[in-house]
Structures are given as C-alpha cells and as structure tokens.
Amino acid sequence: MPTPSLPAGFDFTDPDIYTQRLPMEEFAELRSSAPIWWNEQVPGNGGGFHDGGFWAITKLEDVKEVSRRSDIFSSYENGVIPRFNNDIAREDIEVQRFVMLNMDAPHHTRLRKIISRGFTPRAVGRLHDELHERAQKIAKAAAAAGSGDFVEQVSCELPLQAIAGLLGVPQEDRDKLFRWSNEMTGNDDPEYADIDPKASSAELIMYAMKMAEEKAKNPGDDIVTQLIEADIEGEKLTDDEFGFFVVMLAVAGNETTRNSITQGMMAFADHPDQWELFKKERPETAADEIVRWATPVTCFQRTALEDYELSGVQIKKGQRVIMFYRSANFDEEVFEDPYKFNILRDPNPHVGFGGTGAHYCIGANLAKMTINLIFNAVADNMPDLKPISAPERLRSGWLNGIKHWQVDYTGQCPVAH
C-alpha cells in the first residue's frame, strides 16, 4: 500500500486545522492510499493523551466495524472524545465515564434501555406540533430582523427547544441550557478561553438533579418522570444518572443538530439548484443528506481491549482508533458522487449519527424531525436568504462547529465571496 503524501507532523485532530477548513483532501488521500493510518503525535501534543498517537479510520465499512465491535473497542477506556487541551488532567478525562456515550456494556446497555423510553416514535411525535409552531416563529422573527447571525437567530433555537421540550424545561431556563452546552464544548476555542467547562457541566448536572427531585415529588406525563420512575422490572435512572443524561442531551442533541442546520443552510447557499428543489418538493430525504454533508461530529474514538486485525491492519491492545465520520461520509466506494450535495440521495447510509451498533444516536429521529421543520420554516418565511460573510468556524478537533454566520434574510445584500 502506498504511503500517503501528508505534511510532516500532520495530525487529523489538530484543532487549528479545523478553525480554517475541513481536511477533505487529506482524508481522500488516506482513503485511497492508507485507509487505516497510524497518526503519530509528538509528546505533549496529544490533546490530553500520552500514548504516541492513534489509528485514523477513514472508510465507512471500517468505521461501522469498529462501531459494531463494542466488545473489542471500548468507549469507556479513554472516553470517546479524542481531543482535549494538551494539559488536561487524566482524572478530568475519566470523570466523563459517567456520561452514557463513554460507557461500555453492561452499564451502557442498562442505561440505554431506560433512556430509550423517552425516544419512542410516540414520545418524539408528541413534540411535532409544538416544534412546528416554534420553527415558524423562529423563521418569522429572523425574517423581520432583515439580517443577522443565522447560528444564533435560527440554528440554535429549535434544537434547544426540542431538547428542552422533551425534558419539560421551563421557557425562562432554556437560555441557560444553551449557554452551558456551548461552554462545555468550546473549551479549545479562544472565544470560550475564560470559561471552565467543568463548572458549566456541574451547573447543568445540579440543575438536572433538581428537576429530577421536583418530578419525583410531582410526577407528570413527560420523559423526566418516565426515566426516574421504576418500570415493571424495577429499572430507573438515579438522580446522578439523570444529571449526566441531561449533559449528554445538551451536547449530543443540541450542538450537533444546530451545526447540521447551519451547515445545511450553507450547503443550500452554495447549491442554489438544491434550494430551489427543496422549496418546491420538501423531500423527506433532505434531512439525511444535510446530516451527511454537515457531519457535525468529525470523529469519535475507541480503545482496543485486545489485539485485533481490522482490514488487514494489526491494532494492538491499548491503542486508540479514531473513527473519522467526516471521511467515511464521503467514501467514494459507498456514495455515488460523494462531493455532490444531493437532497434526493437514496439510499444514504451515512454515519452522521454514528456507526451502527450500541452507540448509534438515540435521538436520530428527533434530530431529523427538527431539521425538516426548521428548513420548511426557512423556505416558507425567507426563501431568498443569502450569506453576507463567511462562516466563523469553531476551534475543535472533534466537533464540526460553526460559531457565527452573518446572513441577509431578505436576499437583498450583495453576496460575500
């Protein structure tokens, strides 16, 4: 297999790369020459890990295999987030094991079973009318403003309302939920340099635990009550478990859906033919293509619990493997014309919600409903939207985030190039 021609010292989790761009050419280079590639990291520059590097997994089938083999590849050992500040203490990585994303069976299996009660088609469907109404209000308010930051005025709002609605968070507390989720994920970005993500996480956990206490006293017909009350098998979430579940929702639900919405709109701005098609037909397939194109989580990692051969490459026990969803979603062997944004793409076996297996996104249906509703509302209320300036990217080696994007909702301003 040929050696990939990458610059010396190139690191696919380097947050400085993602401030400017997505390394799509480098991903394509790996897929063609070394789909499973050892990414060496110099001591002190491993984003909190001190093990010499990781295996970069770039093709869709390999990503799916790692996802499926949760008996071999652990989420618990080093957590799933592959990049922190270089000086993070090991105990600050290990504390994240309380969040379901970073668990293995049997703890993960038990929690997932309880939490899935809140994400049944019926539970998600109950939010539809409220979210439809909110989506229309959000788009109308943005249209009335004339221009502004699409991220803050449009993208942020509906995913936040979806999560808050699911949990029954009062309207007056919802902005706090948004602030905490931003602060927990922006720790590598200079905009959040003076924020302590641990403090934000602790505040959110305390808030969630109080909510659980309140619901225990005054149960209702809502997800919180369902999760903290025992089922027929006696299973329920403890207050601590519920607190960490809300942390996961605030990050995995709010942040990822928001970034899919922003980058979906950016894609429509770059592909006006697809926007015209969406406005006319509103195809159900659009949400999946938006998620594939955006791939809001660039990558997650696992750690090998034993030696394992993956597509002819020997992975050693204890080595980290990083699944680059961003690369897998543009795999030429899986997707016809992958660099074409095509809202009618069907089938669309993307891994924007994670690979198959135990950790597949539990809220995928809620995310897709939210995306469909907000784009319908944008098409109804500001069909001629145009960018004013280039988007401002989040500095992160794992989350594909957009912090700000100035747009003209009326389509009257000259377009930025």
What is the predicted function of each stretch?
Residues 1-417:
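Cytochrome P450
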